[in-house]
UniProtKB/Swiss-Prot annotation:
The keyword Transferase applies. Its EC number is 2.4.2.7. The lineage of its organism: Bacteria, Pseudomonadati, Pseudomonadota, Betaproteobacteria, Burkholderiales. Pfam families: Pribosyltran. It comes from the Bacteria. Gene3D superfamilies: 3.40.50.2020. It comes from Ralstonia nicotianae (strain ATCC BAA-1114 / GMI1000). Catalyzes a salvage reaction resulting in the formation of AMP, that is energically less costly than de novo synthesis. This is Adenine phosphoribosyltransferase. Keywords: Cytoplasm, Glycosyltransferase, Purine salvage, Transferase. GO terms for molecular function: adenine phosphoribosyltransferase activity.
Amino acid sequence: MTDASISPSSPVPASTELGDVTRYLRERIRTVPDWPQLGVMFRDITPLLQDPKSLRVLVDVFVHRYMGQGLNLVAGIDARGFILGSIVAYELNLGFVPIRKKGKLPFTTVAEEYMLEYGSATVEIHADACKPGDRVLLIDDLIATGGTMMAGKRLLERLGATVVEGAAIVDLPELGGSRLLMDGGLPLFTVCRFDGH
């Protein structure tokens, strides 16, 4: 990751390097062992969201990275990607597009199926969610296998948008998602990396 500073409005000093900010945020991510199943170390971002200082620092990291990038929209993946994605869109004065699980959107949709470890799932987007040529930032909370984010990328591209980058708070590189996304042509930015899954 490259060095970055935090805005003067942030509670973290402006001279802080991104590495320091990463450590600060990482310390506030709760690890819940054996949830939702035995052997999984669940990375819980809710402590970051509950604390106003941590939330401000987190949002500032994304806002500073993407301001001035000529974006038209931010798309967030159901459900935790909605939280960060909508705040970042607001801060950048952009619209927000939800990418939902199948059957949750009321208007005409475009769907994309993706593989899970034992089966498949589908995400959808409204058919009028973006226009050809739109430059879109795609956000989720965590990158594990990368399947959901890759499906979101394909949906946006089918509508003619360019996905400028995928972004998440947490990367679990051992699960292969970040490699899958980058190999699939999606540049990726994550704030924290954790070993295991």
